[in-house]
Amino acid sequence: MKTLLKNARELKGLKTREVAQLLGIDQALISKFESGTRKPTREQVVKLASLLEIDLETIMVVWLKEKILYEIGEDEFALKALLVAEEEIRYQSKPSKKKLSTTLQKILDEIDTLKTKLDGFRQFDSYRIAQALELEYTFESNRIEGNTMTLRETDLVINEGLTISGKSMREHLEVINHQEAIAYIKDLMQRNSSINEREVLSIHNLILRGIHPEDAGRYRKVQVMIQGSSHMPPQPFLVAKEMENFFIWYETNKSILHPIVLAAEIHERLVTIHPFIDGNGRTSRLVMNLILLQHGYIIANIKGDYDSRMQYYQALETAQTKNNKEDFLLFIAQMEKESLERYLNIIGQ
């Protein structure tokens, strides 16, 4: 653990003092972590992994190994105890692949057929097509949140740098910021970056840049309510812990779930925590689409018209208040299917 932390810190070019400031803990603790005289807590391990860009699974395995050795390493019955515990751990904690409904499995199969077809035409991918679809995504995602820019106005702001008369500065910034956030997740996809706290906060920072600079890229410090929803997000003092669990859940399930289900689950879990004062919906949709892009799918564009918006909100509400995610998983799967069909139609296939 100590070598892993020190090497990662030095690779990032950070001093122990800088790491301590970024994590909000005492510098002496960082030195003790690196010397091996003190072990970080689970929460500190998650934060260190995010800050120093260490694979969460790798560092958690090292942390747990050292924790086990500290507790029972010198006991004469340690090895026997571990052998007995191994089977229990396998039984209790091995993530199981959740059985999907027949309806959901059918649409996932249809999506994968469409993706396979699209994969055969990847060499014909057009920058102009991608640019047009990303523009539509920015338009629709902002429209969901109440932005009144039309698709044409969104285009003029992004590609012509124009100011639209009668539209607020916030609406202009929402358009510009979202388009830059799309570029950012595409860069993360190209670099095969892991989804961690740092990247989620960076996406959110882009979304609120110039709109709420004091809240951009930071977890909320106040309680919030979701207008029109009976779901009550967690209290602000619980947000950091909920987000820690969020990232652990992702690491545990990222290799188990179908990518569409994983992306939809991450979307729902993040927006349910509602970790930010504003920009939760856009950030959640961007993180969802980052996962889809990483697995070779295309952006799932949720429409912002009234009917689509109500279907989206109702599916979310059911997931949040009744712990029934079927409607939401089906909704996201349908959005991805429609996006794939449209893309294939555009390229004439």
Residue locations for each model-derived region?
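Conserved short acidic donor-positioning loop in nucleotide-sugar-dependent glycosyltransferases
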Residues: 62
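Helix-turn-helix DNA-binding elements, focusing on the entry/boundary residues of the two helices
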Residues: 5, 16, 27, 42-45
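FIC/Doc superfamily catalytic core
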Residues: 10, 66-75, 79, 86-349
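Short basic helix-loop element that most often maps to the first helix and adjoining turn
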Residues: 3-22
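Recognition helix of helix-turn-helix/homeodomain-like DNA-binding domains
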Residues: 24-39
